Amino acid sequence: MNITLLANHDIASNLALNLLLPKLKDHRITVYLSSRVGKVGAKPQALEALQSFEQALLHSLSEESDSHASTASRLQSFSALGKLIGRPIDTLNQINSPAGQSILAAGRPDLVVTIRYGVILQQPVIALPRHGVINLHSGPLPDYRGVMASFWGMLKGASELGTTLH
């Protein structure tokens, strides 16, 4: 099956791909990353600091996994994961644009799975894969819509955290 995974260029998505991609080795996998989650604009200073820290961790992970011959016990960088699936992992922020739709359609996906992808897919994109789109949302819907759902749950003192697969 041709499966396209849409994720974000962050630690949580990297971990998810490290866990998921080895299980999909019998399928043809394509991965596209968004470069952010949420709206474009000024962020609070604390979020800027968190993003800088996370990007430094990703850079360190990339250097570490590229310099070790055996990384079986370590998280693989996005670059190393691209080697695992036999194709580079590219950034695709404008997936709803005609050019983005063409890029997605060229892979002829049977299924699209989104995990923390930073763009809400519009109907023309949703209609492309033969078996549809599955989205993993980081919180229970409809209570925790939007980005950082797990953190909103913790902030509100939720006794349980969850996800929504829809």
Give the positions of each predicted feature.
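One-carbon transfer enzymes
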Residues: 1-166
